[in-house]
Amino acid sequence: MLKGILYIIGIYQRYLSPLKGPTCRFYPSCSRYAHESLTRYGLVKGLWLTTIRILKCHPFHPGGVDPVK
């Protein structure tokens, strides 16, 4: 399951993300953050951290540097 999710993120980063350009308000990008958190912490905690990060992605959040902790 984890490998499948990482594969889908890789497909998104390789083929879809370049089409929309650099629009992420965070560094690293949300897809990179998801890949790092899933690789570092596994499926459950990685998905939890990714969900929290995506919930922060809205016009009222300033964004900025938000590394995987």
UniProtKB/Swiss-Prot annotation:
<dbReference type="GO" id="GO:0005886">
    <property type="term" value="C:plasma membrane"/>
</dbReference>
<protein>
    <recommendedName>
        <fullName>Putative membrane protein insertion efficiency factor</fullName>
    </recommendedName>
</protein>
<keyword id="KW-0472">Membrane</keyword>
<dbReference type="InterPro" id="IPR002696">
    <property type="entry name" value="Membr_insert_effic_factor_YidD"/>
</dbReference>
<keyword id="KW-0997">Cell inner membrane</keyword>
<comment type="function">
    <text>Could be involved in insertion of integral membrane proteins into the membrane.</text>
</comment>
<comment type="similarity">
    <text>Belongs to the UPF0161 family.</text>
</comment>
<dbReference type="Pfam" id="PF01809">
    <property type="entry name" value="YidD"/>
</dbReference>
<keyword id="KW-1003">Cell membrane</keyword>
